[in-house]
């Protein structure tokens, strides 16, 4: 039998601890002990008769239609969301478009919870999920639930700017953990926490870690299972809550072999799941991980649907926050997504994830091959990522031909970026992702293989190489 999660209520913020359930959300769950239908005159729910959207139909790929050798190759199926239905396994518009609980539509939530069990199977009793409007919103809920103004939070040395901009206005100090090509260093995390001096830092010892473990944004690094175990052990040692932000989790890839092609690996769903690197959630015996999942990278970012998985304490407190803020994810999105997932089933969704994995592996290989071909090796260095959407590369500062101008790293990067845009290629400057600008002494750029057409990669990288050759000794 799985263990009970630890009582971690001492981690709750003042804001979270003071939240009460919305009475209007509570009354919506009222039931008669006489088992008679409740006629509701309580909540201000609009009558579905006045919803102008009467039915939604969507064309979706038939299972394995993305495989050229499949009998379904190129086939599209149609899924429908009716206004009403007597089928208990249908999410009708009368429900999807109505006010609902902060946890999200029950049918879609059940599907995603089962998906989470298949992939991660958290090893403690009572875990659950809450639907969110994506990981950015989920992070805001988690930060407000766990931190107070004046606290510090552990983050990777380079991190997602939107996450940092969620933290700083809440009065949080972001404490950078050193990184190498394989992600952040457990020994750096342990050193920071072991030697924490509240007077020097001006804040209490951190009790929250924010990390993007797989295909990290911006570096593309992926924590090994051994390093994840070390980090989890340190979280237990120092009583840390781990915010596991994993939008790129399913974009795990085989190693780059120096060519643009990629093998469309034939393996079963069971093999696919087994090959995924274990998550922090899967090793969380204490209930100290809040895992944030999103459909943004594997379905569509505009759907604004995600979910977080956690122990009962954090689920209940998160629900109290969601029900008076975001309330729930878009009903239109939930209706269409559930119709699609119901049509595919769990196995069909895993087939889709395998397809997405292969597609991004191919894209990564094409961009890396273009970089291998055009970027000056005397100036540029990079590690091929094994997950995610990004390649992070360093440009050797010592070879900058305008060193006499004493420009800062951000100034140099901004200059190179502006010249690149003039040449018709856009990319991200490394300083945008730096947590502590005081220790920013290297030139980095981040490129993504997610969006541009494959045939555009060579053109873009050749253009950028020209900019580098105009500014560095190549």
Curated annotation (Swiss-Prot):
Keyword Cytoplasm in record: yes
Transmembrane domains' residue ranges: none
Xref: InterPro entries: Aminotransferase_I/II_large, Class-I_PLP-dep_aminotransf, PyrdxlP-dep_Trfase, PyrdxlP-dep_Trfase_major
Top EC group: transferase
A GO molecular-function descriptor: aromatic-amino-acid transaminase activity
One Pfam short name: Aminotran_1_2
GO biological process, one term: tyrosine biosynthetic process
Superkingdom of this protein's organism: Eukaryota
Record's catalysed reaction(s): an aromatic L-alpha-amino acid + 2-oxoglutarate = an aromatic oxo-acid + L-glutamate
Cofactors, names only: pyridoxal 5'-phosphate
Location in or out of the cell: Cytoplasm
Free-text function comment from the UniProt entry: Has aromatic amino acid transaminase activity.
Family: Belongs to the class-I pyridoxal-phosphate-dependent aminotransferase family.
PANTHER family: AMINOTRANSFERASE, AROMATIC_AMINOADIPATE AMINOTRANSFERASE 1
Name of the protein: Aromatic amino acid aminotransferase C56E4.03
Organism annotation: Schizosaccharomyces pombe (strain 972 / ATCC 24843)
